[in-house]
Regions:
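An amphipathic, aromatic/His-enriched active-site/gating alpha helix that lines ligand/cofactor pockets
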Residues: 25-29, 48-70, 76-77, 86-129, ...
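Short acidic/glycine-enriched loop/turn segments that link adjacent beta-strands
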Residues: 76-79, 204-205
Length: 274
């Protein structure tokens, strides 16, 4: 680790990864580095992991310098737990993960957490797709553990989130993001979606190799929010009937290397993002 122009730079096998200058670093909630984590769980274990996670792994992770952005049930995959966490920089990520996974809380609960899982290595490392595209959680308030426990009827939990993952050719992320911002974002808003964030692959070397990430991926990810599942269904119907949206898809999705993935997610009681 060296210093150049008041910035930290990692010497990696690919290209140096410059950190955001401290004086211009965005607020902590904006998370310039984001992990999208998808866990495959043993059948019937999702509620067990969610209860453990929301009780033991939220404040304790944030105490090390990361932000627990959102935790979700995947409506189409009952054995999947999806969550997002963010960091101020790749250096902060290394320090925070080292502190948490080397600390007493993970040591106390890792066996119980790991007992619910088949695979936890499906992880995409991301950065905001354009200035201002990161998550703004400044107005969000996380329920306490006690408040969350009183929300026994999950169907009444507010919020619905859609994550779309677009797989692109190497080097195509920036151009795709520019076109998406200019042409797709207005269409999403016009049809009832709230764009919560947009991200592209972060190609810096994994600074915490103990936890693998999907290296070599070239993705663009859009995260949209809705009031509830009915609002999302109405949005999908409106998009399907929109000639303008079809034109956007035909023009800009053509460069994808495979069909986009769509995750339909409901937030857990303690998710900030919803």
């Amino acid at each position: 680790l060296t210093k150049q122009d008041n910035r930290s730079v990692y010497k990696t096998g690919r290209s140096p990864c410059f950190e955001i200058p401290t004086v211009n670093r965005p607020p902590r909630y904006a998370s310039p580095v984001v992990e999208l984590r998808q866990y495959t769980l043993k059948p019937g274990q999702r509620e067990t992991l969610i209860a453990l996670f929301d009780r033991e792994f939220v404040e304790t992770q944030e105490a090390t310098g990361m932000t627990v952005i959102g935790q979700f049930r995947d409506l189409d995959r009952p054995n999947m737990f999806v969550w997002l966490r963010g960091f101020e920089s790749m250096e902060t990520r290394k320090d925070a993960l080292s502190a948490f996974y080397g600390g007493p809380v993970w040591a106390a609960h890792r066996d119980a957490a790991n007992a619910t899982m088949i695979d936890s290595d499906d992880v995409l490392l991301l950065k905001p797709a354009w200035q201002g595209a990161g998550f703004d959680l400044s107005g969000s308030k996380r329920p306490t553990t006690a408040e969350a426990q009183s929300m026994s009827d999950r169907s009444r939990l507010p919020g619905f989130v859609e994550i779309s993952i677009h797989h692109l050719r190497p080097g195509a992320e920036a151009g795709f993001a520019e076109r998406f911002q200019a042409e797709a974002v207005p269409q999403l808003a016009a049809n009832g979606a709230r764009l919560l964030g947009a991200f592209i692959s972060e190609h810096c070397e994994n600074t915490f190799p103990r936890l693998p990430v999907r290296a070599g991926e070239n993705v663009f990810i859009a995260v949209a929010g809705f009031d509830d599942g009915d609002s999302h269904a109405g949005f999908q119907t409106a998009l399907a009937a929109s000639p303008a949206w079809r034109a956007v898809r035909e023009t800009h999705w053509a460069g994808s290397t495979k069909p986009a993935e769509t995750l339909r997610l409901t937030p857990t009681a303690r998710s900030l993002l919803r």
